[in-house]
Each structure stands twice: as C-alpha cells, then as structure tokens.
Amino acid sequence: MGLQRGMPLAQLGEPFGITPSSIENVSPGIDQCKDHRMDVSMRSDPTDCSSDTTNTFHSSIHIIQPPPNNGFRLMNWKTDSSSETEIDIGDVRKCGEKADPRQFELLKVLGQGSFGKVFLVRKVRGRDSGHVYAMKVLKKATLKVRDRQRTKLERNILAHISHPFIVKLHYAFQTEGKLYLILDFLRGGDLFTRLSKEVMFTEDDVKFYLAELTLALEHLHSLGIVYRDLKPENILLDADGHIKVTDFGLSKEAIDSEKKTYSFCGTVEYMAPEVINRRGHSMAADFWSLGVLMFEMLTGHLPFQGRDRNDTMTQILKAKLSMPHFLTQEAQSLLRALFKRNSQNRLGAGPDGVEEIKRHAFFAKIDFVKLLNKEIDPPFKPALSTVDSTSYFDPEFTKRTPKDSPALPASANGHEIFRGFSFVSNAVMEERKLIAKSVRSVPTAKTNPFTDDYEILEKIGNGAHSVVHKCQMKATRRKYAVKIVKKAVFDATEEVDILLRHSHHQFVVKLFDVYEDETAIYMIEELCEGGELLDKLVNKKSLGSEKEVAAIMANLLNAVQYLHSQQVAHRDLTAANILFALKDGDPSSLRIVDFGFAKQSRAENGMLMTPCYTAQFVAPEVLRKQGYDRSCDVWSLGVLLHTMLTGCTPFAMGPNDTPDQILQRVGDGKISMTHPVWDTISDEAKDLVRKMLDVDPNRRVTAKQALQHKWIGQKEALPDRPIQSEQVGELDMQNVKVALEQTYKAIASAPSVQLRPVGSSALAKRRMKEILYANYTKNVSANA
C-alpha cells in the first residue's frame, strides 16, 4: 500500500528511529516492507550509494572532526566518497556487565526486513532487570561492506552521545552471526503526527519543540556530527512530552567546519540546496532542514513540494518561498535566515554556530539552560499506553510471534570485522529509574477478558455510573482497585484520557491499565487503602492541627493547580473523592480520584488545546466557562478547608437541611466566624477560607494564588497542637461528613431556571402595557 505524508509513524512501524519509509535510515537497522517506501532519494552517481533498489538511502551522520581522545578512531576516511575503508572501533571503552541475547525477553516484533528485525524486549537479568527497550537485530551475512560501516558508525555515535533530547544506546553486542543494538523504547510516537491529530498548538508551542531540537543539533555539531536526516519521523516524544532525536543511520562523522561531504542522501523535501546540487555540504545543511521543520510545524505544509521528486528539488533550488502572512515577524525572520540558499550566509553557519540561532528574537522568551535541564514543562503530554504497549506500531509486525532465529556467521572472520562492537552504557549501572506506568486510551484498550489477568474481590465503592472493586493481579498477587463503568450509561473516554496524561502527578490516583469489552470499561487504578480524608477525622473524633490541615490543603492545591495549568477541571471535588493511598493517612499519600466529570479544554474540532492556544484563540464565553469550572474546584476545596478547621460545614447546619436552604446560604455568601473555635485559628487561615469561598467566582482566588497564600507558605511554622476540643465541643464527625455531602449534593443539583411562556415574563408584560397605553392614547386622540 502506498503511504502519504502525515501518516502516523506507528503505521510505518517504528517509533525509535527505524523508519520503513526510507530504507537508508534502516540500513544499519531494518529494511522494512518495500511497499512502505515513502521517502526515496535519487542518485545518478553510483559512487554515492549502492544502486541496489532495495537500499535507496545511505548513511547520513557525518563526523566533522572527531573530538580528541573520544575512544574511537576513523581510518582513511575520504570526504569525496571516492573510497571507503572499515572503521576500527576497537578502542571503545566498555564498562559494567556485558550483555548478551539471553538477558532479553522478546515481547513483540516491531519491524522486519532483509537485514533483520526490531523487537520490543524486556531485560530479565542485571541491575536494570524489568526495563523495556527496543532491540535492533542485524544479520551480518546480509550487510554489505557499506552497511557494516554504517552500522558500526551508528553504534559508535550513539555510544558517545549522552543528551536529554537524543535517543540513548544502552547496550551493543554481537554473536557470531548477528549484531544487537539496545536502544530507548519511545512510546510517545511521532511528535508532528500526534500534535496534528490530537492538539491545537501555537507559535509559542512551536518555539518549545524547535528550541529542544536546536539543543540536540548543537550537541551533535559540537561532536563533529552532521545529522543529515532531520524530518518529522525521526523526532519522537518521550513519556513526559520532550523530544528525542532518533535514527543515526544517515549521519556522518569526521569533517570539520571548513570541510564538506558530497553524499546525496536524506529525504528530498528536507534536503538543503547544496545537498541536491552535490557541491558539497557541511553542518549548515542541518539548519536548512531545521527551517523546513519549523515551517511545517507552523503551517502544516512543506515549504517546497512539487508534483514529483524532481519538481520538488527544482523548487528547493529555485522557487521563491511564499511566507504566510499570519506568522509573526520574528518567525518570518528566522525562516528567511534559515532558508538561505548560499549555505555560508545561512544562520548558524557563522563562527558561533548554533548560538546564532539561539540568540534570534524568535527564541527571546526561551531559557535554554532551564530547557536543557527539563525545568520547563512541555506544552503537551501524550496519552501513553502501558510500558510494553505497541499501539503505535504496524500490527502487521506486532501480531507476529517474536523469534530471534539463528544466523550463520558472515564469514570466517565475521566476528573480527565487528571487533569492538560490544558496549554497555554507564547509565545502566548508575541509574535505577522507575518504569512509568500508564495505560492505553480507550479506543486501544486491552480487549482480552479482564478476568484473564485479574481476580475480582470485594466491592469497595459505587457511584451513579460505576462500581469499584478490589482486584488482584493473578501473575503478581498485587492488589489494585478496578473501576467498572457501564458503557451504556456513561462515556469514560475523557476520564481515561485525562488519567493517561496526568496520573503521573503525585496527588492524582495512578492508572495502570484499561480493559474493554462489549458492555464495560475496566480501569485498573491504585488501591487507596487509607480511605476517605474525612473518615480519618471521623475515626479520630477530633480536629487536627493547623499544621496538619495546611499540609493536606497544600497537597490538594498542588494537584488542582497542576490540573488547571494543563487545561483540566475536575468539577467533582467532593470529600468522597479525596483518599489516602496509605493506611497511616500521611498527607503525602493523598490522592484525588474519580475524574468522571472532569473536562479538558478542547477546540471546536475536538482537538485538545494547549494553554497558549487557549489564551490566544478561544472565545471569551468559552474562557468564562472554563474559568467557572476551575473556580468551582477552588470553592469545593474551600468548603473542605472550612470543615477541617472548625468541624462544621460553612453552609449546611445539619444532615436535615434541604438543598434550597443550603443554596440560599451559599447565595448569600456570608461566612460566619463568630463561633468560639475561630478564636483558636490564625488570621491567615481565616483569610484563605474567605478568599476560597468568595461568592463571586471572578474575585475568588485561583488554585495557584491559594497555593502561594501566606498560610500555605508558612505551614511548617504553624501550631502543631490539635485545635482545642473544648472550644469545638464533642464532635459528631459522622454528622459533619453527612452535612458536607449534603452541601456538595445541593450544589450539584442546583435547580435550573424554569422556562415559562414568553408572555409571562416581566419584560413582555411591561411592553404589553406600553402597547395598550399607546393604543389607548391613540384612540382617545381619534375620538377627540
């Protein structure tokens, strides 16, 4: 089948750098299905690349001057491509435990071609046991001399690169017949495809991704490496939404800033003019490709795209670029500076290199130091699947049984050819990272029976649309909570999507897995064994201290402020939806649960909106509605704060109060602080209660403002003694809990306005009187 630009990388089969669309990208990796080819380079000079039609691309990483003492050497490299020799990488330093195929469990086939396969694997031995990786397995016998060189070059480059925005090589090893590369498994998918399908983003959002990409190029160039294959398929998202540059099969090493390479390679639409005309290219070629990516991100279109490849190349060499009028002056300026056909005049080609690009006005608001340290949150977090999910891969491959078949050695000296190939990353021994646990979105949830993997235990809760049970995973005997939602009565898609993106937050309930059958959705969540927040007070039969209450409120505000910053409103922050994960009720184990009524900000076309997009392009009435939802979250926490401090609710006097009575008190907006208990509470606490319960949502503090309030900020210095029980009296906390629930129910069931005939409205009656009076006056005048 033919592919078109914009098709998800998953359908191409590879989200970590082996794209079946350009076989050259796969030359050190996988030559996937020929009918999946999309980007094909044209060659007329057989010295540039092999003329074999099954291997239409050649390596693009070019090293421009190897750093001194870098542990490898390149022998007899000639930049005119007239001759090539093998690369001796025997001097690469190895550290830590040596890996071999027996240490990896094969989980799925991710791709397959004439060179070998790509597997999803899990490490089953060693300190990083349990980690999931992508494993390229290459058959030595099928690798031509040029392919062997590129394979070792890719391994060589990746072994010496450690950068937050570049894919990491963890191990490289070989058997007599095969080569193995163990890489990051990136589950976030292709950045541009994901964003174009899921989220509305703006020029400010583009700055973030382009800045991270610029830092990646800066690092490569500092090592003397020209990337030469910058395109959307090679820029992927990690679990947090940061980019990772992948696929170094087309990169080239060992040229300095004044030398050039003459290879014709890459993807035509992203090629610089000097690559097409074969006059030699340097690192500046990457900056042209950066401009193409920037243009595509901002407009959704390629800057140069003809009827066919030849026409596209002609446009790149000669056509005048049409600059969209809606781009800012800074964006247009940067694009023009990157699209200089004379590479010597191109921004970044000067003596300061990438620094010239970083100093451009387009990036004026970007703090590159914080960005490099990942101290700036990405504008978009992908909805991730389980740690070993392959939902973004071609099912043609993933449905196959993973099997690493034996291979004959390439030749009698096959092992010697790849001498020094083995490698173990330093980080493998030094870092012990937790595996992120999240889940598939509902459309791709697991469809095998939930009871195949879990045993359902006792019921622990229920709601209007769902029931919650304890459950136990059969394989590990670990206990979870399973929320079962009937599809016929409630659509859980939004709830699952929100938890996929945000359950990593410390104070949001963790979502581990999702199952789906014909009648229900099964959400496997963290089991909160500490129970409800107010149950703790019920059991204590006394109030906590201000210090304890402030710690609880700080954590809740932290979670709500995060959700609001991500364009999510919970809209159901009742006391029953705030639980403790641990039995000891430590405030650090607080969890906000039940996102059934939560909402994400979406554009009219259903796509998610980043904060920048929301602020710039959303209608005022939509913003007011979003602000109202978020303000209600703060109000709900204000009710809870009042109750925890005083032992009574602000608007319900007892369990027998009617909704109308409660709503009347809420509408009055009067909060009495005359009870003796308030005499024992600090003025700062009283001030925060008033601000969170302000009847006017426009005056009410936001979650961020509440989190910055003085009372929260000085929580460690607050009194640690319980609020005096003699002032409160004997607490019936069960009645307090019921009264609090009545308050939330009253708000949720606030009666809607009863519509009556138009003629019965006061305005209609007044106008009718005016008409009757006018007619009366007219008749009187006529009779006179």
Curated annotation (Swiss-Prot):
Gene3D superfamilies linked: Phosphorylase Kinase, domain 1 (3.30.200.20), Transferase(Phosphotransferase) domain 1 (1.10.510.10)
GO MF terms held by the record: ATP binding; magnesium ion binding; protein serine kinase activity; ribosomal protein S6 kinase activity
Consequence of gene loss (knockout): RNAi-mediated knockdown in lip-1 and puf-8 double mutant causes a decrease in number of germline tumors and restores normal microtubule organization in spermatocytes.
Sites bearing Phosphoserine, chain numbering: S263, S405, S422
Signal peptide: none
Record: residues binding ATP: 110-118, 136, 460-468, 483
CDD domains: STKc_RSK_C, STKc_RSK_N
Protein name stated in the entry: Putative ribosomal protein S6 kinase alpha-1
Lineage: Eukaryota, Metazoa, Ecdysozoa, Nematoda, Chromadorea
Gene behind this protein: rskn-1
